[in-house]
Amino acid sequence: PKGALRQTVLCKNGTIPAPLPARVSTFASPDDKTGACKVGQRTRWQGANGANCTVEQFCLEQYAMQGFRGYHSEGGIIKFLFVLLMWDVLFLPIPGAFETPYQRAPMDLGTDVFVIARQNAIEKQLQCIRDTGGLDIIQRVDSRERPQKTYAMGCRWDEFSLPTLLEIAECLG
């Protein structure tokens, strides 16, 4: 289905997965006896074990059969990688950005002021990522912050390990 993999990350030696097989037998019937889906109700698919599952789980199972490993995280992995890569920029001591040491993010994040106040630091960090690929930055920040499980937006320390994050970042390029 269109958009089924929009938030799913797949990786296998930098290769692109083959399209999913279009077999009608893989779809679970909707709960409705008419065969129609109810408005607002998610479609259900038949998973590898025969039980109903979400379209995301179905896709991950199909790609796993091709040797790929994947994650469905609704953008959580990308957000986590962004925060690790831009940590030093996000947490610069900009006046007014932090009122308490318990904030998950600077108060000006998502505003024009955020970029204006950090323009040089942002450009420098992006150039560093272009030059090195950023894996070293992810490693450094993760190794420093993970032991304390620093409370920061997008950081899901218990959900994604450093090796997993590095592998995904490398696959994304």
Show the residue positions of the predicted features.
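Nuclease catalytic cores
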Residues: 5-173
